[in-house]
């Protein structure tokens, strides 16, 4: 499925809907399951739009993909503008933080609307609004964990690179590996199998990244 939000291309893979349905498998009512999938879709789109809009402010052309692991926003430089790889720490941190904080702002708007008296008596709508609030807060907090490839991990890497360009990536991946293992072990103790899978996957990805860094030449600082 492909469409545009304004000028931002959005592509949704079929695996995204499978992932959302699996996460909502405890919903026995088909209508409530569809509602849950819609909530996940809206929440992750809001998150990725946060990245996309801030990237656009910095002269990048964003595109959004929703897939079996959530969402990704990719950037190409606009004509005559620098690529993201040449950005300094502050811009990279702002782009990374924009996703979680877009979700927090959306959840805050929902809460503000309720305080203002904008309510509904429809039970299904109330459930959807409650889930939208919870998912946007929860997804934002999860993404702020200092673990690559999450947003918090990208913030950490931008900072460690600023502190040590030569060793920044290695430090970021080591911290990410420790956090991923911790998440997997904690989730295992609580039989939270999806979180076990995510922790294991992210641990594997960071181990692979560390192995590649061992064989790679020292990184060159981008020219700005």
Give the label of every model feature segment.
Residues 1-224:
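Hydrophobic transmembrane alpha-helices and their immediate loop junctions
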């Amino acid at each position: 499925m492909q469409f545009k939000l304004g000028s931002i291309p959005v592509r949704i893979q079929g695996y995204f809907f499978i992932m959302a349905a699996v996460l909502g498998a405890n919903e026995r009512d088909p209508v409530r399951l569809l509602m849950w999938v819609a909530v996940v879709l809206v929440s992750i789109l809001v998150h990725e739009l946060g990245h996309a809009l801030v990237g656009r402010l910095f002269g990048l052309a964003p595109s959004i993909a929703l897939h079996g692991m959530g969402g990704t926003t990719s950037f190409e430089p606009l004509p005559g503008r620098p690529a993201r790889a040449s950005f300094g720490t502050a811009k990279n941190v702002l782009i990374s933080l924009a996703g979680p904080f877009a979700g927090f702002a959306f959840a805050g708007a929902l809460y503000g609307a309720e305080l203002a008296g904008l309510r509904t008596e429809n039970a299904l709508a109330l459930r959807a609004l409650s889930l939208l609030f919870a998912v946007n807060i929860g997804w934002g907090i999860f993404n702020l964990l200092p673990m690559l490839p999450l947003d918090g991990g990208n913030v950490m890497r931008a900072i460690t690179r600023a502190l040590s360009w030569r060793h920044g990536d290695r430090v970021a991946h080591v911290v990410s590996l420790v956090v991923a293992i911790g998440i997997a072990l904690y989730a295992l103790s609580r039989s939270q199998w999806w979180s076990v899978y995510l922790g294991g996957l992210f641990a594997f990805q960071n181990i692979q990244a560390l192995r590649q860094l061992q064989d790679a030449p020292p990184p060159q600082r981008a020219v700005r």
